[in-house]
């Protein structure tokens, strides 16, 4: 049973790493949008309120938090679906083992995601 959990743990790391890359691409896109919004706001005094809001550090932080939450939500949903499929196959369709494997893997995925978010937030400070 521990071997199954160990193997599934590596599967989750493989699942979440590409998702993290997508999240970083989203963060890069957001940084570009921030730069564009700031240049637009300074070039045009009557720029839209969205561009001016992005120039505000608090609004930028809130927008970044929303983007991170969406990326994390997508990653967790995908991880849950894959965990169920992998655990179901590994447990040989035994309900108790399936539930136990799924709980273990979801906890591991949440710990990994928490670590990634804390690491990202530390870099932002």
Curated annotation (Swiss-Prot):
This is U11-myrmicitoxin-Ta1a. The lineage of its organism: Eukaryota, Metazoa, Ecdysozoa, Arthropoda, Hexapoda. Transmembrane segments: none annotated. Residues 1-21 form the signal peptide. Disulfide bonds join 101-124. It comes from the Eukaryota. It comes from Tetramorium africanum. Coiled coil: none annotated. The keyword Lipid metabolism does not apply. Expressed by the venom gland.
């Amino acid at each position: 049973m521990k071997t199954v959990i160990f193997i599934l743990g590596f599967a989750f790391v493989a699942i979440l790493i590409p998702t993290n890359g997508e999240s970083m691409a989203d963060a890069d896109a957001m940084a570009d949008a921030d730069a564009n919004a700031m240049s637009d706001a300074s070039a045009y005094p009557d720029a839209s309120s969205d561009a001016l809001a992005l120039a505000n550090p608090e609004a930028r932080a809130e927008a970044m938090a929303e983007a991170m939450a969406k990326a994390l939500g997508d990653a967790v949903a995908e991880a849950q679906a894959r965990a169920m499929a992998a655990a179901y196959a590994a447990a040989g369709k035994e309900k108790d083992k399936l539930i136990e494997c799924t709980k273990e893997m979801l906890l591991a995925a949440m710990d990994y995601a928490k670590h990634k978010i804390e690491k990202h937030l530390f870099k932002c400070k």
